[in-house]
């Protein structure tokens, strides 16, 4: 009988880890997110958060109360580099600082982003001072 010793190879550091908190009712956010990061070396993990009907400020704030638990379940006991809370209206209703605090309880080392805060940062970076919106 022949045997060959194979020494294991360890990866010292993985790609940046991004966790997404997706609304239970949002069927597209993962696909959209993957399209944004597809050519980048990013490891992407998702968990869903329960949403409540009707969509009221009170229900959006109620939903935000679950952010810490939902965040904990994204790679439990592992660090993430960034956590994205994928609910624009929920961020505005509860406040970005509140969402950030709730995420940091579960993943203290993670940066926190939301669609609304990312848009504001992009507008500032591009030095855009005025935005016009046309809706029906």
Regions picked out by a protein language model, each given a short descriptive name:
Residues 128-136:
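An alpha-beta-alpha
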Residues 100-123:
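Short, acidic/small-residue loops that bind anionic groups at enzyme active sites
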Residues 70-80, 122, 127:
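Phosphate/pyrophosphate-binding loops at sites that engage ATP/ADP/AMP, CoA/4′-phosphopantetheine
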Residues 74-92:
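Short acidic, glycine-rich surface-loop motifs adjacent to enzyme active sites
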Residues 16-18, 126-129:
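Nucleotide donor/acceptor-binding cores
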Residues 1-69, 136:
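N-terminal glycine-rich anion-binding loop in soluble enzyme alpha/beta folds
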Residues 51, 88-91, 119:
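Short histidine/acidic/glycine/proline-rich micro-motifs that form metal-
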């Amino acid at each position: 009988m022949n045997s060959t010793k194979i020494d294991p190879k360890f990866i010292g550091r993985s790609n940046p880890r991004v966790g997404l908190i997706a609304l239970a009712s949002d069927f597209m956010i993962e696909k959209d997110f993957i399209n944004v990061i597809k050519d980048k070396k990013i490891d992407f993990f998702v968990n869903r958060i329960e949403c409540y009907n009707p969509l009221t400020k009170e229900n959006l704030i109620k939903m935000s109360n679950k952010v810490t638990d939902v965040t904990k379940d994204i790679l439990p006991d592992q660090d993430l580099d960034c956590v994205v809370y994928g609910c624009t209206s929920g961020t505005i209703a509860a406040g970005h600082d509140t969402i950030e605090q709730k995420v940091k309880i579960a993943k203290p080392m993670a940066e926190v982003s939301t669609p609304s805060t990312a848009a504001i940062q992009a507008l500032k970076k591009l030095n855009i001072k005025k935005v016009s919106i046309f809706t029906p």
